[in-house]
A protein has these predicted regions:
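Short beta-strand/turn micro-motifs composed of small residues
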Residues: 54-55, 110
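Glycine- (often His-adjacent) and acidic-residue-rich active-site loop
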Residues: 55-94
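Catalytic-core regions built around general acid/base machinery
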Residues: 38, 91, 95-102
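Conserved CoA-thioester-binding segment of acyl-CoA-metabolizing enzymes
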Residues: 1-54, 97
Length: 124
């Protein structure tokens, strides 16, 4: 199974690739957590000069949060939003805040569908 996010450092550049092209690179909680950790690493490493984010595939940069999966989880549990769904949105907004205040250049290679949380992780 492919990783849903690919994080690497090449030539002093942090590179984030959202790797869920079959889901238009929609964000999961795992992606949000890994992006948060990677941005912390990049910001605190003087050898890293900037960060680039891109989406895999040809249709989308990022369609936002994977609300289909969150909806299914809520329906499966038969009630109001779960702790995980609330934590997802809380942490995703914190990620947007981190990107907004990031101390190094943050470059989004937007190509294709970009909406909701995709806008947040691309240009906050």
């Amino acid at each position: 199974m492919n990783e849903e996010i690919i994080l690497k450092i090449e030539n002093s550049v942090g590179i984030i690739t959202l790797n869920r092209p079959e889901r238009l690179n929609a964000l999961t909680y795992n992606i949000v957590q890994k992006m948060n950790d990677f941005l912390d690493k990049c910001e605190n490493d003087d050898d890293i000069k900037c960060v680039i984010i891109e989406g895999a595939g040809e249709k989308a940069f990022c369609a936002g949060g994977d609300v289909v999966s969150l909806r299914k989880q809520v329906l499966d549990e038969g009630g109001p939003p779960t702790e995980l769904s609330e934590k997802f949105f809380y942490d995703e907004y914190l990620l947007n805040y981190k990107i907004n205040n990031f101390k190094k250049p943050y470059i989004a290679l937007i190509d294709g569908v970009t909406m909701g949380g995709g806008v947040g992780v691309s240009m906050h």
